[in-house]
Design a protein with these regions (language model features):
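Short, small-residue-rich loop/turn micro-motifs
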Residues: 14, 72, 78, 83, ...
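Basic, Lys/Arg- and aromatic-enriched nucleic-acid-binding interface segment
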Residues: 2-73, 82, 92-95, 115-117, ...
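Short, basic (Lys/Arg/His-rich) helix/loop patches that form interaction surfaces
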Residues: 43-55, 64, 99, 107-130, ...
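Well-ordered beta-strand positions in beta-sheet-rich domains
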Residues: 85, 96-100
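Short, polar N-cap/turn motifs at the start of nucleic acid-interacting alpha helices
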Residues: 3-4, 77-85, 149-151, 170-193, ...
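Short clusters of hydrophobic/aromatic residues that line enzyme substrate/ligand-binding pockets
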Residues: 10, 79, 88, 123, ...
Length: 229
């Protein structure tokens, strides 16, 4: 039928958050009433006065919502700013993964490139540019801004995106799960490849970045209705 939605065949969508360390400021039980906390977090991230590498990581974390270790180990060789794509091997599934980059993400990468673009890592360590930044760098910045481990973690950006994209912006669960680099399978148990729904995911990632901008800027954000596509 023309109104068939393949998302209905997904096994276990949406997947449960990975591990215990996924505290995030947004409580889905409170719904849209809790989005003000997200706006406050985003404003704090953009006003952080630390070094430029950590600044860029903090701004990118909610936009791209990759795993914290994948963000830390981001390599310039894997990022194509002209195509607005970041391709790498997902740390958990060990499968090739594509992150479509919103215009906001591309801008952040371009601003950082003159500082770190000659090296291997997008976010090099403070002590050695041949190593990625410390796994505690983003956590320490969050603590400095007043967010403890029970309130917000580096992994919490994934939990935030997963919940808001689904429950507030109403994007299809399979689009979200693919973008989270979870091992998504259809009703036959066949895993989708990395390019599955890529055009739709590109639109979703741009809509997500635009939505976060609207929250941060205090605009009257109207949820999108896309799930029943």
């Amino acid at each position: 039928p023309t109104n068939y939605n393949p998302a209905a065949d997904l096994v276990g969508a949406l997947a449960r958050p990975e591990g215990r360390n996924f505290a995030t400021v947004y409580d889905p039980k409170k719904g849209r009433d809790d989005l003000g906390k997200v706006a406050e977090l985003l404003r704090a991230l953009h006003s952080y006065q630390g070094g430029p590498v950590v600044q860029a990581a903090l701004k990118l974390a909610p936009i791209v919502f990759v795993r914290p270790g994948e963000l830390r180990h981001a390599r310039w060789a894997d990022i194509d700013l002209d195509k607005a794509e970041w391709r790498y091997l997902a740390s958990k599934t060990k499968q090739p993964h594509i992150v479509p980059l919103s215009s906001q993400a591309v801008e952040i990468f371009r601003e950082l490139h003159p500082l770190t673009g000659r090296g291997q890592y997008v976010f090099p360590g403070a002590r050695s540019r041949s190593r990625p930044m410390s796994e505690n760098a983003v956590t320490a910045a969050l603590r400095y801004m007043g967010y403890d481990g029970e309130t917000m973690t580096g992994h919490g950006f994934r939990a935030l995106a997963r919940t808001v994209l689904d429950e507030v912006l109403s994007f299809r669960p399979d689009f979200i799960e693919h973008q989270l680099a979870h091992a998504v399978k259809d009703a036959n148990g066949t895993a989708y490849n990395r390019t599955a729904h890529l055009p739709e995911r590109q639109k979703m990632m741009q809509a997500w970045a635009d939505y976060l901008d609207s929250l941060r800027e205090g605009g009257n954000v109207v949820p999108l209705r896309r799930k029943a596509v």
